[in-house]
Amino acid sequence: MSDFDFTQRFLFDDTDVRGELADLRGSYAEVLAKHPYPEPVAQLLGEMLAAAALLVGTLKFDGLLVLQARSPGPIPLLMVECSSEREVRGIARYHAEQVEPGAGLRELMPEGLLTLTIDPRRGQRYQGIVELRGESLADCLSGYFADSEQLPTRFWLNADGRRARGLLLQQLPADRLKDAEARTLNWEHLVTLADTLTAEELLGLDNETLLRRLYHQEAVRLFEPLPLRFRCSCSRERSANALSSLGQADAEQLLRERDGLVVVDCQFCNQRYEFDATDIAQLFAGGGSGAPSATRH
């Protein structure tokens, strides 16, 4: 069992189907350590972390991928970001009194919308939206790919507060199998086998054992794992830029309202950035991010 977070790609040698497995423990623990989430919220957030990791392993881009779910229900917001450098962070907002033990996606995020955003460093920003109408986040993501007429893609996701795991299957353009009926039958066969996967197996088995148990009659080629890690992209410079964007008059007014100390908290990691009168003055005197001030988690 690996001691780092990773995704791992695999191929079915005789078909036009690829797969990806995601395993997050350290980064999942980092996300949960920042906020005290109830178990159902932590589970959904873990599934979204695994989904983002799978998508970054599947989609080719240089920039940032954002998965965001919004709802008027007990969980108004789930949000995960994963960069092409394979750095992940996530957050949830919830109404504690409305979160029932054992509740699933339908109960926690009724009438919800799931947004997938790819924000490349160069080129056009892409955004797709799908209703959260499935029984699970995996169902919703699979439905998104079906509705958007992309390559047939299926997801299996589970998380238990300690480990977040995901499996993805994707049908590639015709190469090895040219016959349309044969391609369809092969795809349905592989998906049907994956549908037998239990949460206990996905969360408890290593990748080699899992694939052998599912596809012992198939020729599966497993590639080297690629690491993932938790990292928040917040910084003192970004916080200073946000204050600068207010304009000098508004920033100084905010400073007076806050008794001489403006505090900017990162919603993802709880890092605190403090700006006093000297810092604010330097912001508007070309001083960049201001003089050093105390920061804390």
From Swiss-Prot:
Molecular function GO terms recorded: protein folding chaperone; unfolded protein binding
InterPro entries, sorted: Heat_shock_Hsp33, Heat_shock_Hsp33_C, Heat_shock_Hsp33_N, Hsp33_helix_hairpin_bin_dom_sf
Keyword rRNA-binding in record: no
GO BP annotations, alphabetical order: protein refolding
Disulfide pattern: 232-234, 266-269
GO cellular component labels: cytoplasm
Pfam families assigned to the protein according to its UniProt record, in alphabetical order: HSP33 (PF01430)
Swiss-Prot/TrEMBL keywords: Chaperone, Cytoplasm, Disulfide bond, Redox-active center, Zinc
Post-translational modification: Under oxidizing conditions two disulfide bonds are formed involving the reactive cysteines. Under reducing conditions zinc is bound to the reactive cysteines and the protein is inactive.
Subcellular location per the Swiss-Prot or TrEMBL entry: Cytoplasm
PANTHER family: 33 KDA CHAPERONIN (PTHR30111:SF1)
Matching HAMAP family: HslO (MF_00117)
Protein role: Redox regulated molecular chaperone. Protects both thermally unfolding and oxidatively damaged proteins from irreversible aggregation. Plays an important role in the bacterial defense system toward oxidative stress.
Family: Belongs to the HSP33 family.
Protein name (Swiss-Prot/TrEMBL): 33 kDa chaperonin
Organism: Azotobacter vinelandii (strain DJ / ATCC BAA-1303)
